[in-house]
Amino acid sequence: MKVINYQDYRPYMGTLIDIRDPISSKENPINGSINIYYEKLLMNYKTMLDKNKAYYLICGKGKKSKEVTRILEYYGYNVTNVVR
């Protein structure tokens, strides 16, 4: 599993996805990210993600993003866990 620090992320690398719930994301936004709650992402990844693009997943503490990164990586997606 690929892991990078948030400080090393740059927008040209791929899409930064904040997988926290919408309330947490709105109260404490992560600069440069789009919010897709992890449950929604896991239920709809086939229609929401493109296997030819890079995605960087981030959450509050790193546990959920690590878990979701592993799952999506298993299904062949180019995903990286982002830690703060």
Language-model-detected regions and their locations in the chain:
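Structural signal for short hydrophobic segments within the conserved structured cores
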Residues: 15, 34-36, 80
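Flexible, polar/low-complexity N-terminal or interdomain linker segments that lie immediately upstream
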Residues: 1-28, 38
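A short helix-to-beta-strand connector/capping loop
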Residues: 12, 31-32, 77
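Helix-loop module immediately N-terminal to the HCX5R catalytic loop
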Residues: 32-56
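Short amphipathic alpha-helical segments and helix-helix/interface helices
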Residues: 6-10, 46, 69
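Alpha-helical elements of the RecA-like P-loop NTPase motor core of helicases
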Residues: 26-27, 43, 66-70
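Generic alpha-helical hydrophobic packing signal
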Residues: 3, 42-45, 84
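Catalytic cysteine-centered active loop of the rhodanese-like fold, especially the PTP/DSP P-loop
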Residues: 48-84
